[in-house]
């Protein structure tokens, strides 16, 4: 499965459960290079998911998406480590994790261990 197809599945699941989704899309520059025109350090996770309920509970998840064979780059690992150190919930999700992803996104308070 291509990463963009997997990403669409994750976004659909997140929206089904009421999560707000942020994804910065890469664009092709005039010189043919691909870039994401935002400022910041390279390697920021692909998705930021945010949810709050009427009872005041909420959650924020940072998710780096990879194909089943995709490799997490060093600059991506650095972001994941920094986010974890700051107390954030952060995952590397792969297509084989879809059931666990769905379970995690269906609940606010439970943290489901997912492949890294």
Model-found features: residue ranges?
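Catalytic phosphate/metal-binding cores of nucleic-acid and nucleotide-processing enzymes, i.e., regions
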Residues: 1-116
